């Protein structure tokens, strides 16, 4: 496959109308933060000559998000349609999809002691597992400052003792977490969803909003995607 044939699709986090997707102090709104990271990742990948699409860029709902379900279910269905239409147009073997989010331990408007980075795939063995492995490699490389931050934060009581910088499940031989998430289960190409620390942990939020944190999160996505393309698509 030629580099010019590769189709990268990036996913933004939930709409602004979806309640509870922010830090307790409102300093971080997942919908805004995700779109900022997506924009930075998209620009960098395009500078390397790749074709990049975003599943949904506006903060608010579209009239095309039709149906009888909840707004969130209609939103997810819309995103999957966008991805699968591009897969049908260009060929799913030429496509990959990475949806970028920020995790939360609760939806109660309170700070919590959870932290860490992780990457989700659908259940079973697919090429998404290989994409997730590349994302984990990039996260380990780019989040060294966060590893030190969590270690210090655990001593100060900002994280519970069981927290680790990288959330993983090695029971099936790789690091990704498998879950029945709609956008990774229903899309036709290799697809992963990253949860980039926790929006309801004070230390995580401070890191995410710092220049160091923002650049690390963007850079790990760029590197993970490029590594996957080099290893499995070109």
Residue ranges and their predicted role:
Residues 73-93, 128, 181-186:
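Mature extracellular/periplasmic domains of secretome proteins
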């Amino acid at each position: 496959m030629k580099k010019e044939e590769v189709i990268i699709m990036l996913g933004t986090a939930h709409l602004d109308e979806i309640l509870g997707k922010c830090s307790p102090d409102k300093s971080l709104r997942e919908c805004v933060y995700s779109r900022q990271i997506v924009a930075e990742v998209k620009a960098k990948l395009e500078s390397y000559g790749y074709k990049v699409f975003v599943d949904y860029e506006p903060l608010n709902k579209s009239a095309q998000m039709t149906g009888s379900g909840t707004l969130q279910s209609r939103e997810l269905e819309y995103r999957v349609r966008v991805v699968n239409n591009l897969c049908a147009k260009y060929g799913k073997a030429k496509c990959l999809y990475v949806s970028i989010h920020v995790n939360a331990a609760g939806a109660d408007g309170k700070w919590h002691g959870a932290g860490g980075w992780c990457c989700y795939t659908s259940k079973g063995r697919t090429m998404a597992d290989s994409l997730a492995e590349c994302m984990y490699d990039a996260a380990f490389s780019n989040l060294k400052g966060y590893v030190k931050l969590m270690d210090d934060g655990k001593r100060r009581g900002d994280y519970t003792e069981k927290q680790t910088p990288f959330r993983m499940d090695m029971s099936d031989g790789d690091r990704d977490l498998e879950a029945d998430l709609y956008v990774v289960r229903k899309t036709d190409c290799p697809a992963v969803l990253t949860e980039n620390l926790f929006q309801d942990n004070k230390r995580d939020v401070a890191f995410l909003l710092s220049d160091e944190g923002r650049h690390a999160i963007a850079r790990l996505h760029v590197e993970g995607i490029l590594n996957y393309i080099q290893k499995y698509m070109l």
